[in-house]
Each structure stands twice: as C-alpha cells, then as structure tokens.
C-alpha cells in the first residue's frame, strides 16, 4: 500500500496553455509572411520580410508562451494549492508500510572556497540533516565532498596528502596544530612537503581535520586531465566512477570495498590519480548540494517517501531561497534575492502545479542513483555507436556491444562533461528514459543558496545559460553541413513519448535565451537593408518594427506578466499561506506586492534591458565554437576597492559594449540616411526614424550605465554599501552549571572553536615555500618539546636596534638566514617559524 493519493495526470490547463501559445505563434508568423507577400513591391523586400518572419518565430515563441501561461496561472483551482499534483509536492507523503528506507549520499562539489566562511556553515546544516535522517529512519546517510581544490593546493602531490591523512587517522585527529602533527611523522617522510606553500599545507590540513572529526568523506582527483568546460560535472563523475567501479570490482574479485577503492584509485602503473578518505560509498539516492547552500533538518526524511511511492521518479527539485546571512547585504542583494524568491516561490511552483515538468537546476536536488547509472550507460552506448559509424561498421545492439562495456566506470560520463548546462542535459536524458521529475515545496523545508554580489557575476551566469541552451539545441556552424542544425539529444527529445505540451514548454523556455539575441540580429538586417536601399524600394518592413518589439516586451513582461503573477501569488497566499517563504508568510498582501514590485520588477527592468547582449554573446560562443570566458561564481565574500571593482567591470563588459557601440552606429547611420546624409538637418519623417532607431539606441546606452548602477562596490555610499566579509567570531557561552548534555551542536562548537583559532593563527602568518623540509626537517635531534621549533624560540633574543619593529630581522640575522638558505635549500629557522 502506497502512502500517496496524488493524481496520475497533470492539470488540463497545461495542455491548453501550450497548444494556445504554439498556435498563436504560428498564426503571428503566418500573418507576417502573408503581409510580406501581399505587399509585394520588389524581390529583395520579400526575401528580407520572409527572413525576418522566420527569425521572429524564435523571438516570439517564448514571449507568447510566457504571456499565455501567465494568464492561465490565474485559473489554477484553489484545491491545487492545498494538495499534491502530479509534478508538484506541497505535503509530505507517507512511507509505504513494507518498504525500507533508502540510503542517501549528500554529494557536495567544492573547489577552493574558504573552509571557515563557506564550507563550515554548509557542512553543519548537512550534518544536522544527516543525523536527523539516520536517527529517525535507521538507514544510512553519508556526506562526500568532491574536493577539487585539495590537489591544487598540494600541486598534485598525492604522497603529501596520504601522509597527512594517514597521520590524522593514526592520531585520531587530536592535534589541531600542524607542527604537532608533523612531529608524529618520520623525518624521511616529511620530504613530501618540500616546495609546497605553507598556506596551502595549512588549508589542506584544516580541511582533512574537519572531515575526520565530523565523519565526512572526501574525494580529491588529480589536477591532470580534468575534462569539461566547467569542472563540476567531471568532479562529480570522479566520485561516481570511484565508488561504483569499486562496487563492481568488489563483486567480481570477491575483495572488500575498501580494497577495491584503493585498487580503483591507482593507475595500471601503480601511480595514484585520486585521493579519498572516509566513507565515499553511494546510496540509492544522491542529494546534490552547492558549497554555499544550506538545507533544513527534515528535508531528507520528508522527501525519501516520494521515491518509495513512485519508482519512475528520477529527481526532486526543491525550493530555494537566498541565504539569511546574505539578505540585505546591499541594495543589489535586495533586488536579486526578491527576484530569486519570485522564481522559486512563484514561477517554478506555479508552472509545476499547472502541470509542467519541473526544471533541474543542478543544486538542491535529490536524484535516484539508478537513473544516473542509466544516463551513463546511454551516453557510453552513443559513443560506441558513433565510433562504429566513423569506421564504417553497421549499428550494433546493446547485447552485441556487451553490457559490461557499457559499464566501464573508467570513462562513463554520468554527468555530461561536454556540456555547459550539464544539469539541463541530464534532465532531458531522464525524461527520454521515462523518468519523471517533481518540484518539492514543503513548508519550512527550503534550501538556502548564496547569490551573486555584482552585476558582472550574474550577467556571466546568464551568458553561460545561453551558451548551454544553444549547446543542447543546435550544433555549431562548422557541423551544420554534416550533422544538420539540431543536436541528436534535442531531436531525440522531440521524438520521445513525452507529452507534446511539455515539449512546447521546454522548447519555448530554451528559445527564451535565443530571443534576447534575436533583436540584435533582426535590427542589423533591417538597418543594413535600409542603408543599402538607395532607390527607396524597401520602405516599411511589416516583419520588424523596432518600437513595436520594445512595446510588446514591456506589455508582455511588465503589464501582463506582473499583473497575472501578483494575482496568482495573492490567490496562493489565501489558499495556502505555508507555500510562501517565511519572509513573506507573516506579512500581508500589500507587503508581498510591494516587495515584488519595488525590488523584483525594478531589477528586471534594468537587468534584462542589457541581457540581450549577453544572450547573443553566449549563443555566438557555441555557434562559432569560441572558448567560453565565464568562470564559476565566487562564493567567498568580496572585499575590494571601488577602483578595482570599476576595472573589473570594464574588463568584463568589453564584449557587451562592443555590441552596444555597433547598435549605436547603425542607429545613427539610419538617422543620417533619412536626413540625406546631412549632419545639420533632421530627417523629414522624424517620428518614423525615432521609432526605428530610438529603441536600439536606448538598449545600447543601457549597456553602459546598468553595469555601474547594479554594482554596489562601485556606487557604495549612500546605496547601502556591502558588508566586506568581516568574519563573525562565535560567541563563547558561559557554563552556568547543571547537567551538561553533549549533543552534536555542543561538540561542533567545541571543535570549531579550536579549529577556528588555529585557522586564524595560520592566516596571520606569511606564505612561504617549505624548502628545507627535505634535509633538515622540523627539528634537531635534541628537540623533545611539544612543538618542533621550541628550541628556536627559547634562545636568548638578540638586542635589536632602537626603533626596530618586533618581527623585523636585523642585518646580522638576515646574513645568517641567507647562509643557511644557501647551504640547506632554505632557512630552517625561518621555515620553522612559519609552521
């Protein structure tokens, strides 16, 4: 007996919404083509009109769908907000009586984020959720960090990593100072640290110490051969290949899982390519979390019954809001946090209730492990078939290729490493394989994520989204002749058994990133045709009206869009107030509407007036096979001056400003053309010229001032300057006596206080190269004290010149340090003082 009574079919509104939007778009494009033929004057004008009409389909598809779906969301019945629907869960389900709880693995890909500022708060929330699930279910739940920064710090020195981790395990993590730990290491083994930065060694030591104390597994791969445009996919794959490969090896050879892990982490020549520690096994479910994201205590135990009741459920996407610590950090954070809340609390939730499949955004998700394995086998099969086609062999079935070859974990891509939007690509694969997704918005079970702090970072993310959307749909230009315009993945998606209304929804959503750049292309064609029209044969173009496009966008997004969205949010508040985030739940309707209009709409007006340039750049990055220049989002706090922020802004917006300057030149040339190329006269048809060139000039000018307005590090005072990442020291609680209960929070507070103190001490030391460790190690033979440099500090201090700083070396000490460095590779005393 299942613990669910959700409907088996989505609401019928979704079908009517998609069909109406698609037919409306076809009707508008057909009308434009009819007008082009009906108003025939010259062959050139007809060709231009037809070309612009076909391009207009891409731009209109998302706009029409957005306006139609916004109106339809107002007709969602009240009952849908109070019960679970096919693709949305607002009430936790009950576990089936005879079903067993599933093992869960929390996987967190990290790089070089700050342990104290970013990783610790995230891991604390994960540990609380882990222990809550284990205590109440009896099942297994482990945390694994895919640490891509560890080997970067250690310069791919696996011997040093093994030495430090094995010593931490042997000493049971009781040494919080690196100098104390290194005393337990034999002198010949310390040579592995030679040439490493002292700060890098400190960072790795603190990470390993934290992982050990809180029973957190970690996987650190080699810095060589890290495939993928963005390393998150290959980082997660390294953990999946290691664990699942060890499981297969353990079953095949009859060895233990730990022995299989060690064998699977080494190359055939005995060299190591991946480091691991702790429990790195993978459960039946995987929770993917970002390095700067927090989760609620009960989110796992409330979500697992969803997978137990539906064997076709491949993933759940959870509602996510902005970090509480980051809210109100600056005026930009206020606007972006309101926009993020509206996205997850409004559009994603309403679309899922409406009947559309939820998106998979890459974090705050729970995935079924078997579904990920199926996607990996499909990718391997396609690679094998492409290889057979290249050498001229016919198509072979899975049985002929061999199931074992499809499970070669040394090269299987469970997450796509050749796509920028690996999460979106995985979602399409899951839908093609027959798995469903579900949007989960349990009350008080929201995830929290960090958001970007500047316009440049957010614009870079949207440029990456545009690149990923085009990568999924279209081949690059150099492959069009041989493979056609559409990718095999997108063609398979269109031919799959997925309901047609969802194909329309997903296609229109991806075309939304194309429509932003369509205006630049369409305006360029119309303006160049107008400039080359010497005989005045083209005249007015029915397929393109610059002012009409701008007015249509304003009407769709800010009149129809916000009117219907606010109506749907008000209806949801009165139907089920618990669906709103806590920041909006305790306030009235006026506060909800005012905050969404004040921050969210104002942000969209400014932000998306410039995003067309970045959508165009992202599409050209893929279509012209250009290397992507957008990096990962910075998760650490930013502390920079106004001058540095301005220079970074100029450097990032060079491409956008080039497009803006190009649009300004075209607009100005059309004005001169209408004025008979006379600089001191206005055009005869002033209104027509302004309606054609004015919107393009407005969008071009926006590209210059919006990046400055939306950057709080440039404006600063009086616009609520951002907090510059000041570290908050934990308050020491006084023990007032009584019975002391040692729980997880107390244990973490005690351990964190020691580790935080040691991290602060290490950060205040200068960064030096550990060069003397190969010969002199850390101490002499007569050193028996707790720290390896005690004898050095016990020597009588030399008399310093009057007025010298406390840490300033005298001339004689500098000479002696140079002599020791020349004789032993580096100054032993100087190196020991750094440690």
Place the predicted regions along the sequence by residue.
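Acidic, Ser/Thr-rich low-complexity segments on the non-lumenal side of membrane proteins
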Residues: 90-134, 145, 603-614, 741-760, ...
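Internal catalytic domains of large membrane-associated glycosyltransferases
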Residues: 61, 65-495
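Membrane-interface alpha-helices
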Residues: 136, 613-641
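Loop-to-transmembrane boundary segments
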Residues: 2-22, 107-119, 486-515, 593-597, ...
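Hydrophobic transmembrane helical bundles of polytopic secretory-pathway membrane proteins
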Residues: 1-89
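Intrinsically disordered, low-complexity cytosolic terminal tails
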Residues: 190-194, 734-835
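A membrane-cytosol interface segment of integral membrane proteins
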Residues: 137, 146-158, 162, 634-682
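Membrane-embedded multi-pass helical conduit in multi-pass membrane proteins
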Residues: 29-52, 505-623, 648-733, 738-749
